[in-house]
Amino acid sequence: DLLMQGKNVAVITFTNAATDEIFNRLDYTSVFHISTIHSFVWDIIRHHQADIKKLYCFYIEEDIKVLEKKLDETKNKTTKTYFANVEKLKYQKERLTKAQTIEKFVYNPNGSNPEYNALKHAEVIKISAQMINESDMLQRIIAQRYPILLIDESQDTKKELVDAFFEIQKNYADIFTLGLLGDQKQRIYTDGKENIGSIIPNKWEKPRKKMNYRCAKRIVKLANAIGKDIELHAEQDPREDANEGTVRLFVIQQYDGINKD
């Protein structure tokens, strides 16, 4: 029915490898539209060039204001940090001048995007999140085109983008269903939505994966012990035929010369 109406179930994830894996597991069923997060949101906003340009320039202008304030408030104007900020300010002003001449922004989800009119990966997420969050038209387009949207690794998805998708769910609950797939214990990036489980409405279904098919018994036991402080009632059980496994703790002497960045 969805295909006959020109609609799809959208599944968005982080990497091309994950996209290929999901395609394979779903046996390339055409009702599913599977893509990376960057590809998905770029496809939504790419025709709205004027809005992209407006936000692109706005973010640069905000960076310029911050840098100018830093420079004005710097008392010691002979430090490396001061001169680095001077160069950053010069660079941002040059970017703004070039940006005002751009007629069309481009973006390649699989490339480095070196062109002066090409958006960087982080810029696509930032711009699209704000555009979707503020535009009823874009929300309606997503809801009508993808009545079911599943976010893989939702615990690491940029929080502004998660907020935008929640806005669609709130405004178009009668035709749009949002699904979050992920594990708070596996959260890697700090710019993801913190404690995402706490913002999920009570009326949502909350299926849990109780069986851990992959790990040895001791690994599951350790993960449960660590995870209880992160997410309540998220314990898993190992397969009955799983290996007992081994957990080792390594203690090393700290070396101050290590680059922790």
PLM region spans:
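Conserved RecA-like ASCE P-loop NTPase motor core of nucleic-acid helicases/translocases
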Residues: M4-A18, F32-I34, L181, K209-M211, ...
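P-loop NTPase Walker
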Residues: D1-I52
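Short, surface-exposed amphipathic charged segments that create phosphate/polyanion-binding patches used
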Residues: R46-L55, K221-I226
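A polyampholytic, Gly/Pro-enriched intrinsically disordered region
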Residues: I52-K65, K228-A234
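Accessory N-terminal region flanking or inserted into the helicase ATPase core
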Residues: D72-L150, K159-A164, T190
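Short helix-terminating capping/connector loops at secondary-structure junctions
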Residues: L3-K7, I141-Q144, A173-I175
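Phosphate- and divalent-cation-binding pockets in alpha/beta enzyme and binding domains
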Residues: E21, D43, I141, E160, ...
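Conserved RecA-like helicase ATPase core segment
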Residues: A164-N243
